[in-house]
Amino acid sequence: MVKSSRFRFFSLAAWNWRLYRRGAAVLLGAATLLEAGLLFGCAGNLNFAATSYDALLSTSGAGVVFAIVLGATLVVAQAPLLAASSGKTRAAYTILTFRLPRWQILAGQTLATAFGMLLALAWQAAVWFGLFWPVAAVQDAVAGRYFGFTVSAAGRLWWAFATSPWFALVLPRTPEGCGLWAGCLAAVSLLAATVGVHRGWRRLLAFCMAAVGSGCCVLVAGVQFGSEGFGPLFWVRAGAPLTVLALLAVLAVPGALLALHRAEMAK
């Protein structure tokens, strides 16, 4: 760990990441194969030969896989802390051995979780971009004898990127979108990080709060799907879930810090 106690939570976050990176790699690898199979399956169907790439993401179920991956990443990122609190890891990894302010433990776990979420978003963007050309080639091959014209793959990709709400989720195109999803990412990462510092019924309560917070993010994403931009109507519809998410994040911090001070996860 670094010598400066002010920034030691960065080292803790890096340590946590190293402990769960294999699980994250397995998760993302399996999801990549599943999404590829779903997209190629739809692209090879004549009924979807003229379907836009954006519509394929929705029709094939690739978007659902993406949502599941984000939720699973939140769980996988907590594995080191949950193992430590249950005594299923090396004795050196325990709350009593961290000689740093307790808030830095929470900050480090939150940062490690947020990094995993960012990695999942970057992976998803890369997968969707990378699969576009082979999927488009399959569509063109299937529809070649039924249509007398084609649209360049590059043009279709640009149109999908410019108009698709799926791409807007993984690569926000406006300052409002970047700020919105940065806030949601920070809040849900914090809520997930608090689960591992509790035990017993408090852990169950923290898990429920994290689940509700994740549900709020899903609702916000749904509002974004049905809105054009971030106008007044969007903020009216998304105001309630965003408020609940913010309140949950604020309420979760005192309880988590108290649990850390009591060393509830130590054995």
Residue ranges and their predicted role:
Residues 1-92, 102-267:
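Hydrophobic alpha-helical transmembrane segments of membrane proteins
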Residues 97-101:
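Short helix-to-coil transition segments within interhelical loops
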